[in-house]
Amino acid sequence: PFLDLCIWKGRFPSTKARFCSTELKREVILYKLQFPLIDQGYKIISWQGVRADESPDRAKLPISDNIGDGITNFRPIHKWSAQDCFDMHFKHHVEPNPLYKQGMGRVGCMPCIHCNKAELRAIADRFPKEIDRIQYWERKVGAASRRGSATLFTSDKRGHGIKELVEWSKTTRGGKHYDLIPLTEDQSACSSVYGLCE
């Protein structure tokens, strides 16, 4: 569905046009699940696992809000830190998503348009087929684009297209020098931005 949506729109989502979340998550849940239940007389409480420290926009969200039409949003972990989430996993003997021990700061889409430089490098090192898939998608979406080009990440001084961004992800000092230290490290070893390997 994601590739089809991008081809239909002739572009990839961006931080200002996050149609991926809107059309592939929010709208599907509303129209296929929540509205039919409301039509049957049910009230909906939508439990959402968003945390305030994930972004400035999420920090502004209330813990609970009634959005009308019989729907209330409830964000029980809004004030939690990432560490609080992992502590709750461990308290109940639930293993976190294994991607968190492979250098990923977020899981869901791979890569997410919000992934950072280190995460992009980790994806390229551990999952090179994902990078090839994105390159293929860029060609497909680019063919449908009015501009004749489409990239998952914004094209700027870092480069144009996933392959150039992966090369940039291997650099330090403003993208001018390759960071050689990771080349000496075991890429299959545990790596966590949340300290899960200690």
Please provide the spans of the model-predicted regions:
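Nucleotide-activated chemistry modules centered on ATP-dependent adenylation/adenylyltransferase
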Residues: 1-198
